[in-house]
Amino acid sequence: MLNTLIVGASGYAGAELVSYVNRHPHMTITALTVSAQSNDAGKLISDLHPQLKGIVDLPLQPMSDVRDFSADVDVVFLATAHEVSHDLAPQFLQAGCVVFDLSGAFRVNDRAFYEKYYGFTHQYPELLEQAVYGLAEWNADKLNTANLIAVPGCYPTAAQLSLKPLIDGGLLDLTQWPVINATSGVSGAGRKAAISNSFCEVSLQPYGVFTHRHQPEIAAHLGAEVIFTPHLGNFPRGILETITCRLKAGVTHAQVADVLQKAYGDKPLVRLYDKGVPALKNVVGLPFCDIGFAVQGEHLIVVATEDNLLKGAAAQAVQCANIRFGFAETQSLI
């Protein structure tokens, strides 16, 4: 059994991790922690997330010193803020733990990226070099031996799963940048209360236009520029992305279908649509990314859906852990 610590367990993604790890036959939860200053310290996880009542009733322990929790721990999931993960990951790695970081602290191997988009100076360039980007369907060979796994962002997961096989397969005319219009549920903003996330304020609106940190994350890992516009939707969870691309001259519907099938035909957590396009309701609460598309002449529209808290966060983290330790890829997920 892998002794597993979940840091930042009080949040939405943290609670999903608790659920997955609790039912994993090869993992056992050693502790659930929050920051020492958290108002949730000392509370039961099931008091904050009643869906866990009678299933996981562990307390949220305040953590001020990593050494109090790292002894005999094999796996650490960091469901923490970017700056917090930046500081904690090196300490857990030094203690011999395998770290799965759900924040953006190690996703892009470029220190300037963090100063520009995250507002802090990255102190661990050697870890940026070592970190494996956990886009599970594409990086399994590197995940096998990784000790620091940077779980991709929610928007980048759906965008890259949609575009990577098309770009790698040479089907797109990249002189016209792919345009990604993405809408996420309010849970993507986290559990902390804010006026902008309140029931009466949320409608449907774009944000981070030309400035969102997920645009350079997507572009860096695709090796191609994209235009990315996120939107906040008036629903709790889920992401839907509509991606508009130009195909190279002569590329057919059948070629697009073939490239996607070759990429994901044996990947259990990506579901391809032979006809039509996905709807959000079919992935909420599930660990899948659903992908469908339509072609008209040289124009391609790809639609991808996922649960932002699952395939966009907790489920992908556990999927990466399964790959890392040689378990069935979908263990505890489906």
From Swiss-Prot:
BP term (GO), one: L-arginine biosynthetic process
SUPFAM superfamilies in alphabetical order: Glyceraldehyde-3-phosphate dehydrogenase-like, C-terminal domain, NAD(P)-binding Rossmann-fold domains
HAMAP family for the chain: ArgC_type1
Active site: 154
Single GO molecular function: N-acetyl-gamma-glutamyl-phosphate reductase activity
Disulfide bonds: none
Pathway note: Amino-acid biosynthesis; L-arginine biosynthesis; N(2)-acetyl-L-ornithine from L-glutamate: step 3/4
Subcellular location: Cytoplasm
InterPro entries in UniProt: AGPR_AS, AGPR_type-1, NAD(P)-bd_dom_sf, NAGSA_dehydrogenase, Semialdehyde_DH_NAD-bd
Keyword Ribonucleoprotein attributed: no
Reactions listed under catalytic activity: N-acetyl-L-glutamate 5-semialdehyde + phosphate + NADP(+) = N-acetyl-L-glutamyl 5-phosphate + NADPH + H(+)
A single Gene Ontology CC term: cytoplasm
Family indicated by similarity: Belongs to the NAGSA dehydrogenase family. Type 1 subfamily.
Name recorded for this polypeptide: N-acetyl-gamma-glutamyl-phosphate reductase
One Pfam entry name: Semialdhyde_dh
Catalytic activity, EC: 1.2.1.38
Keyword NADP: yes
